[in-house]
């Protein structure tokens, strides 16, 4: 059965030794298996990665890899149609699949007693799937995937990706079409096309199986052998060869977007594929140019020219090709020539100053600590082992690759700048609001694109459950029709020990000791959010929180504060919500005291930098304007207006309104901070390998200097209005989908019935195993997903059900929503309740 076995111990990250022990072996049919034991939690993750993605497709048959991923969730010979959704839910687990340009992956994370059942399920769709494919099932999934594509395209910049690919890649290049493909290609797919794709790419020799988590290795090997070893092998397909893009000239293109309210510019320079020796210095080059307040592109485009709220520049490397790219959405009515020129001014400034060695060191530290974060769950660890094995044959590649990043020098960075960026041809795509061609980069030509219209929409499948044709069973050495029992190692519900202390200034602190990784996670929660903002100063809580992070301190400029955190590899954020204000962060255990000193400076002595204030205000105003451009946000705002009223904070959210934010001053923020930033209305939560004594010692400055004060907690009326039973329509011209939301006022999280409501909603619309999803997607194909939920807030309470549906299916979708929700009480049974409680207990 086994061709070879190897055990490797991997070490990475000098901040603290981190090891992943794994065993890799290969079955006779070519399936590569990787086992990683992690007993820290009683769960197990199973993942399979096939080396096939959209890059393996042909012109005229695009979208097949992603479409096939969908098909594998339908059924197999021994799994009834759509049972994958219900079985994983009943085990208290989670699952999904994903398709990239270069691979397709499936995963499950379940309590440890579900391992054998999951292996049975995965092996069944690997080796016992293809005979079950029917024309009806094919057509239903074509409808679902078509609506997934429409959902992405029905909003601002939804077509920008297709425009970019057409003009960046040469015709026929493996990356020249989107992963989801073209709707006309999907609608022309046949059962024979699916079978051909399966036989070529879904062979064991083209796959890697990873099991990571709490399991017995010997038993796992027996299960893998039992369920996978007999699957017929086949030749391993040749991987798609590297095909780097070369541009004979710079190309400039524009596309008029009927939904966009602000221009967007994408620029890309051809570079190299993943794992190429130049990809590592290119990663740091991009960060040095655009990452951080002191980077040249940020300084010029954001601070000096004030063209956008943020910028970025990234080395985007995949298996076949790579690029250094940026996508920036500007403020409304910005001429994209001005942004385009900023890039070249930034390049010039970078050349003049050279590589900032301190910044390079910070970026290396951040990358290294980020590796620890990628070791935080069995699923992420399994994914890293999968990718390394699929593309290099080395499961530990992500860890050994660390040395490639750490060894990058300033000379390497300047070399790749000269080789790939300076004076090189590139592609620029300007996506501009319809009718504003003058905002496009000068010299751009109009993109020649054709997209599906509403008149062209069609539904391939017939409504109702897919009728399954009889099929021939594939012979097996075991009885695969029998669903395996759960293993005997069912985990007990084990709530971690939580310690509590109240500091002398009144701050309540709760914590959990966790030594799995050398990181500490912390969160300050201030019981004061937008719900307490005066109506005329709506948004003051949110803007104050943003200024704590962006405005520096009394002794540090905004740039110095950002760099001080970055020196420790710490990630710190501050933001306001409707009901609370949050300051969250993570850092190495050993740096916690130093990071707390910086956090104390933020909380107690904000810098109130005026330039940072103006930028923060402009950023929030930009967010408010953008929130008025998508179907979902427009519908949600209308729903909340009906529920709460036009000027209510729950309608407008934590940002406030354009009028109130424009009127806010620095004095308003200082006044808010002075009145409400008190430890008496704050709490702190912390998880890491630190004792309460160590934490208290690290926070001594904050404890000493953060003085308690009395706080006025009066606020707005929090009761929703009595809603009439009406249907409201909002026109969103030309959209290929309709967004539906319906609901009413809900329960407070403090209400005794709030948890019961969550249990009741579980089967209605909480997940892909619920009734709304089952009927609107799986049985009708009208949508990519349909869900419902109760908001979990103390005051901002509502129940809502929602979905983005095919435009031509709007009326029947609304009728189905009303029918399902209205009749839910009549079909809800004691058995459904017991199954829900059982799965929710297991999931916890």
Where are these regions (language model features)?
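Sec-dependent signal peptide recognition
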Residues: 1-5
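M16 family metallopeptidases and their MPP-like homologs
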Residues: 36, 41-57, 63-67, 82-128, ...
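Metal-associated gating/positioning segment near the N- to mid-region
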Residues: 71-79, 86
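Alpha-helical scaffold elements lining the catalytic groove of polysaccharide deacetylases
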Residues: 185-190, 194, 660-664, 669
């Amino acid at each position: 059965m086994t061709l070879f076995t190897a055990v490797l111990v991997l070490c990475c990250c000098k901040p603290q030794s981190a090891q992943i022990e794994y065993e890799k072996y290969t079955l006779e049919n070519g399936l590569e298996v990787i086992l990683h034991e992690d007993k820290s939690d009683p769960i197990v993750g199973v993942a399979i990665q096939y080396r096939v993605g959209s890059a393996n497709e042909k012109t005229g048959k695009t979208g097949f890899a992603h479409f096939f991923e969908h098909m594998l969730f339908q059924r197999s010979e021994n799994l009834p149609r759509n049972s994958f959704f219900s079985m994983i839910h009943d085990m208290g687990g989670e699952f999904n699949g994903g398709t990239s340009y270069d691979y397709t992956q499936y995963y499950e994370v379940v309590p440890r007693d579900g391992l054998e059942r999951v292996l049975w399920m995965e092996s069944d769709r690997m080796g016992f799937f293809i005979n079950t494919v029917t024309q009806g099932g094919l057509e239903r999934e074509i409808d679902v995937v078509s609506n997934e594509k429409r959902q992405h395209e029905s909003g601002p910049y939804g077509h920008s990706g297709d425009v970019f690919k057409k003009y960046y890649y040469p015709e026929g290049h493996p990356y020249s079409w989107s992963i989801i493909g073209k709707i006309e290609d999907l609608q022309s797919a046949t059962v024979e096309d699916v079978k051909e794709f399966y036989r070529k790419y879904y062979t064991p020799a083209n796959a890697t199986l990873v099991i990571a988590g709490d399991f017995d290795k010997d038993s796992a090997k027996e299960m893998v052998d039992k369920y996978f070893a007999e699957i017929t092998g086949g030749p391993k397909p040749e991987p798609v060869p590297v095909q780097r893009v070369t541009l004979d000239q710079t190309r400039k293109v524009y596309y008029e977007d009927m939904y966009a309210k602000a221009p967007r510019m994408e620029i890309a320079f051809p570079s190299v594929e993943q794992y190429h020796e130049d990809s590592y210095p290119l990663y740091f080059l991009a960060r040095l140019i655009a990452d951080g307040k002191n980077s040249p592109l940020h300084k010029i485009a954001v601070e000096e020219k004030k063209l956008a709220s943020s910028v970025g520049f990234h080395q985007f490397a995949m298996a076949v090709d790579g690029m250094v790219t940026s996508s920036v959405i500007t403020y409304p009515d910005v001429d994209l020539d001005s942004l385009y020129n900023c890039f070249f001014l930034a390049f010039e400034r970078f050349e003049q100053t050279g590589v900032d060695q301190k910044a390079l060191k910070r970026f290396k530290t951040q990358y290294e600590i980020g590796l620890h974060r990628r070791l935080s769950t069995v699923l992420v660890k399994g994914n890293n082992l999968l990718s390394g094995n699929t593309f290099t044959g080395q499961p530990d590649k992500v860890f050994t690759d660390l040395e490639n990043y750490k060894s990058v020098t300033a000379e390497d960075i300047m070399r790749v700048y000269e080789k790939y960026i300076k004076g090189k041809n590139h592609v620029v795509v300007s996506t501009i609001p319809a009718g504003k061609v003058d905002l496009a980069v000068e010299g751009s030509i109009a993109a020649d694109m054709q997209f599906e219209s509403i008149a062209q929409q069609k539904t391939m499948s017939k409504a109702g459950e897919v009728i399954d044709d009889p099929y021939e069973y594939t012979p097996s050495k075991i009885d695969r029709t029998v669903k395996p029992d759960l293993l005997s190692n069912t985990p007990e519900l084990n709530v971690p020990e939580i310690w509590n202390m109240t500091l002398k200034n009144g701050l309540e602190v709760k914590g959990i000791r966790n030594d799995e990784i050398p990181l500490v996670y912390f969160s300050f929660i201030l019981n004061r959010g937008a719900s307490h903002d005066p109506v005329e100063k709506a948004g003051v809580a949110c803007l104050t929180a943003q200024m704590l992070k962006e405005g520096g301190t009394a002794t540090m400029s905004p740039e110095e504060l950002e760099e001080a955190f970055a020196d420790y590899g710490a990630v710190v954020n501050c933001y306001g919500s409707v009901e609370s204000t949050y300051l969250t962060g993570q850092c190495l255990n050993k740096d916690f005291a130093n990071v707390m000193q910086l956090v104390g400076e933020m909380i107690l002595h904000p810098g109130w930098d005026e330039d940072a204030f103006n930028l923060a205000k402009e950023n929030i105003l930009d967010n408010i304007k953008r929130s008025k451009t998508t179907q979902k946000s427009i519908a949600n705002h209308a729903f909340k207006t009906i529920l709460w009223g036009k000027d209510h904070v729950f309608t407008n959210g934590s940002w406030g309104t354009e009028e109130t934010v424009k009127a806010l001053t620095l004095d308003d923020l200082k006044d808010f901070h002075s009145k409400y930033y008190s430890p008496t209305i704050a709490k702190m939560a912390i998880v890491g390998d630190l004792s309460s004594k160590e934490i208290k010692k690290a926070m001594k400055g904050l404890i000493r200097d953060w003085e308690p004060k009395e706080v006025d907690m009066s606020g707005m009326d929090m009761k929703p209005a009595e809603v009439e039973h009406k249907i409201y329509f909002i026109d969103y011209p030309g959209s290929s989908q309709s967004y539906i939301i319906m609901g009413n006022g809900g329960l407070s999280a403090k209400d005794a019935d709030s948890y019961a409501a969550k249990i009741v909603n579980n089967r209605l619309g909480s997940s892909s195993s619920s009734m709304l999803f089952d009927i609107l997607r799986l049985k009708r194909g009208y949508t990519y997903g349909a869900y419902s939920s109760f908001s979990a807030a103390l005051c901002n309470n509502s129940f809502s059900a929602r979905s983005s549906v095919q435009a031509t299916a709007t009326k029947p979708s609304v009728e189905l929503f009303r029918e399902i929700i209205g009749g839910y009480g009549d079909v809800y049974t004691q058995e459904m309740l017991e199954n829900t409680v059982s799965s929710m207990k297991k999931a916890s």
